[in-house]
């Protein structure tokens, strides 16, 4: 990793694509973005050891409780409102997630950022009319593909790692 200093909030970018959309929509008007890694740790009590051993088996990252400020003119709200209003479930609630990490200083020279891509279930949780927020979760489905992203005109293009 190149560079120094604290990572800024705008350097972790969440993009979603739902339905028959061709391009990703960046989630811009959320006021929080926390990625929960959800480590799956198992304890094994091997007969040759005095104390049990903890083994990290896997991660199941997800984003929960993402509060989006509802601006009528914003594409991110329009996309999520379509899911909420339509009460979409099953396959209609599945989209594509692209999580782009724009804080590697090396990207300035390569024009590529590290990223994760995965199908994801988008779960609408709460519409708070008083606060003007729509809260939702993004839960990746299956394997998360690591790779890089280039951006042209605000549209990201994902390339899986070799």
Predicted regions mapped to residue ranges:
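Solvent-exposed edge beta-strands and adjacent loop segments
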Residues: 1-72, 119-132
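Short beta-strand and beta-hairpin "edge-sheet" elements
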Residues: 35, 100-146
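Extracellular/virion structural assembly segments
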Residues: 50-116, 146-151
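Short, low-complexity, polar/charged sequence segments that are solvent-exposed and flexible
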Residues: 84-90, 118-122, 156-160
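Intrinsically disordered, low-complexity terminal/linker regions enriched in Pro/Ser/Gly
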Residues: 148-162
């Amino acid at each position: 990793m190149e560079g120094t200093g604290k990572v800024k909030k705008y350097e972790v970018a969440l993009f979603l694509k739902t339905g028959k959309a061709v391009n990703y929509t960046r989630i811009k008007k959320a006021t929080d973005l926390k990625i929960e890694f959800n480590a799956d740790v198992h304890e094994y009590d091997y007969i040759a050891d005095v104390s049990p051993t903890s083994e990290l088996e896997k991660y199941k990252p997800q984003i929960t409780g993402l509060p989006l400020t509802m601006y009528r003119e914003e594409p991110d709200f329009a996309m999520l409102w379509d899911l909420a209003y339509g009460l979409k479930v099953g396959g209609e609630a599945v989209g594509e997630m692209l999580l782009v990490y724009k804080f590697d200083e090396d990207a300035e020279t390569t024009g590529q950022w590290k990223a994760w891509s995965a199908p994801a279930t988008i779960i609408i949780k709460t519409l708070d009319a008083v606060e003007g927020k729509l809260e939702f979760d993004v839960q990746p489905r299956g394997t998360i593909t690591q790779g890089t992203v280039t951006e042209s005109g605000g549209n990201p293009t994902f390339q899986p790692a070799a």
